[in-house]
Amino acid sequence: MGFLIGGSCFVPSVPLHSRFLSSPSSSSSSSPSSSQFGLLCSSNVAKFKRRRPTLASLNQEDGYEYDVASAKRRAFLLVGISVLPFLQLRSPALADERGNEIKTSKVDLETEVAVVSEGTSPNPFLALLNGLGIFSAGVLGALYALARQDTKAAEETIESLKNQLKDRERALVLKEKDFEAKLQHEQEERKKEVEKAKEEQLSLINQLNSAKDLVTELGRELSSEKKLCEKLKDQIESLENSLSKAGEDKEALETKLREKLDLVEGLQDRINLLSLELKDSEEKAQRFNASLAKKEAELKELNSIYTQTSRDLAEAKLEIKQQKEELIRTQSELDSKNSAIEELNTRITTLVAEKESYIQKLDSISKDYSALKLTSETQAAADAELISRKEQEIQQLNENLDRALDDVNKSKDKVADLTEKYEDSKRMLDIELTTVKNLRHELEGTKKTLQASRDRVSDLETMLDESRALCSKLESELAIVHEEWKEAKERYERNLDAEKQKNEISASELALEKDLRRRVKDELEGVTHELKESSVKNQSLQKELVEIYKKVETSNKELEEEKKTVLSLNKEVKGMEKQILMEREARKSLETDLEEAVKSLDEMNKNTSILSRELEKVNTHASNLEDEKEVLQRSLGEAKNASKEAKENVEDAHILVMSLGKEREVLEKKVKKLEEDLGSAKGEILRMRSQPDSVKAVNSTDNKEKSDNTVTVKKVVRRRKSSTSS
């Protein structure tokens, strides 16, 4: 053995392959129970403890080799110790000590081989039990390891999913914090921009004050600048028109933004509805999985019921075969009985012929009456014995027929039970088919809902694309408006610079126009009011633009969130599609199983139809047997009647023989009388001869007596003919 390499271990008496291949008959024996296996192992261990002689094990060679092969030796030792309880130990040797010489180990091995050769032959049944135990232990270990691996894999997947969920939650928290920080940063930047705008407004106010001072100083130059003021008025009117257009554009943009916001809200509602529908579909899928598990359990139960019914059918077939054999036997017995009855009939016919011959030969039988009487008595006794035997055989046949009928009734009961079981299984299969149809309808409904959800998702994607396009258009329009506002601002600053230059140029000319200063002041005050109003309008426009930017950013964020939700929905839809594919595959397997079950049911139907046909044949055969029984009974009755008639005929013949005997005695008496008369007649003739005179008288008397004798003989012959005719 391989585990003799390292350390002290047990040396088995017979190799393991010889134990498993010792007897072919042991392989065909049935597997024992686990308790018997444990008892046998314990008995083998006890025998091993009784018989073990000590042997020296193989010597440890070198320290280096031991260090190299230590792991292998430990493994072999563990394998040997685990296999020892399952081995048959008739004459084992225990190596307890480690020698220092290789020669002693070789000698011990040779002695062990000799002991093994002298030992008793192993029990093949126990060897087979050991092999089966080892095989079952290996199979159970492998199955347990596979189950543990599956459970570990499932637990690892669950833990990985939990870790992924935790990582996603952390990422979401970090994104929220980053988003809040970005919002705060943007708010601070907007505050800074507002402060800058306020500073610019203050600078503009200071510039306007300086311009007022310059106007007060340059009142003379207003006359020349009227034209310029008119031009400025025209420009202001154009700016106001542009501002009014910008306001109208702003209102249109606000209406568009409101419409987009309404669309976004509708999309959010649709997304919520889709999420609810997806949750419902997930719940339905879970329900489908649960129902599928139930159906699988029910299919297993049906398979077990089907196996039981197949076993019952096989037993019923065996019983039917036995009943057929018994019926064949009964048929053979009935054929033998029929042949015996035919022989009896032939004998009866022969007896009738003999009777007729006896009746025809009554004249000859009258001479051999004593011999005929003896033969008739012996034949009557033999006929009585034959009739009694035949009656006993008929009673046995009746008993066999009753037993066969009882067996047929039992088989009918069994077939009725089998038909009931078959109907129950058929009902269960009908119920399962209805459930499968319902599941198919539910699957079609889920498919329709999934298609509707896909259509809605596609519609949402189109709406999102449209909203994205509109947002891009709005951003472009806002950029255009912002650029126009910048251009208007630059034009306004340019005009202010030009006015400053013109005011400096016209400072020399304002001295002449001081008279018109007040009018110009009034006009300038109106212009300043208009400028203030325009600045206020510009500030309001800036605020509105800031709000528009905020709304655009919020809409962008909402669009990003919608994109994420759409991606998650797409992922969920893909997962649902995968689940549906898995469910379709499971459904296909279930449909195949159902088709197999239907095929098995069809086979069962065929078998039941065959059994019913066989039962009908058995019933017809039983009815035929009953008819034959009735025919036999009738034939037996007829035979009995014929035997009775034969007995009566024999009795009549006996009576006739007795009457003939009596008539014979009478005739003998008459003959004696006639002989006496003849003697007397002879004496008288002699006397008459002596007396010749009286001859005539004697002759006349003789003639009279002869006539009388002839008359009596004719009467006797007539009586015999009448008796024979009767």
From Swiss-Prot:
One Gene Ontology term from the biological process aspect of the record: regulation of starch biosynthetic process
Motif Nuclear localization signal in this chain: 715-722
GO MF annotation terms: DNA binding
Keywords: Chloroplast, Coiled coil, DNA-binding, Membrane, Nucleus, Plastid, Starch biosynthesis, Thylakoid, Transit peptide, Transmembrane, Transmembrane helix
Biased composition (Polar residues): 691-701
Region (Disordered): 678-726
Spans traversing the lipid bilayer: 125-145
Membrane topology, from the record: Single-pass membrane protein
Domain of life, per lineage: Eukaryota
PTM (free text): Predicted to be translocated into the thylakoid by the Tat system. The position of the transit peptide cleavages have not been experimentally proven.
Predominant place of localization: plastid
Effect of gene knockout: Larger chloroplast starch granules than wild-type. However, in most chloroplasts only one large starch granule is present, in contrast to many in wild-type. No accumulation of ADP-glucose, the substrate for starch synthesis. No effect in amylopectin and amylose biosynthesis. Mislocalized PTST2 within chloroplasts. Loss of DNA-binding activity in leaf chloroplasts. Loss of both chloroplastic and nuclear localization in leaves.
Transit peptide location on this chain: 1-41, 42-95
Skewed-composition ranges (Basic residues): 715-726
One GO location term (cellular component): chloroplast thylakoid membrane
Chloroplast as UniProt keyword: yes
Known role: DNA-binding protein required for the initiation of starch granules biosynthesis in leaf chloroplasts. Anchored to the thylakoid membranes with its C-terminus facing into the stroma where it is essential for localizing PTST2 and SS4 to the stromal spaces between the thylakoid membranes in order to begin starch granule formation. Associated with leaf chloroplastic nucleoids in vivo. Binds to various chloroplastic double-stranded DNA fragments without particular sequence specificity in vitro.
Subunit structure: Interacts with PTST2; the interaction is essential for the initiation of starch granules biosynthesis in leaf chloroplasts, for the correct location of the process in the stromal spaces between the thylakoid membranes, and for the association of PTST2 with the thylakoid membranes.
Free-text comment about domains: The C-terminal part is necessary for DNA-binding.
The name this protein goes by in its record: MAR-binding filament-like protein 1
Organism phylogeny: Eukaryota, Viridiplantae, Streptophyta, Embryophyta, Tracheophyta
Gene: MFP1
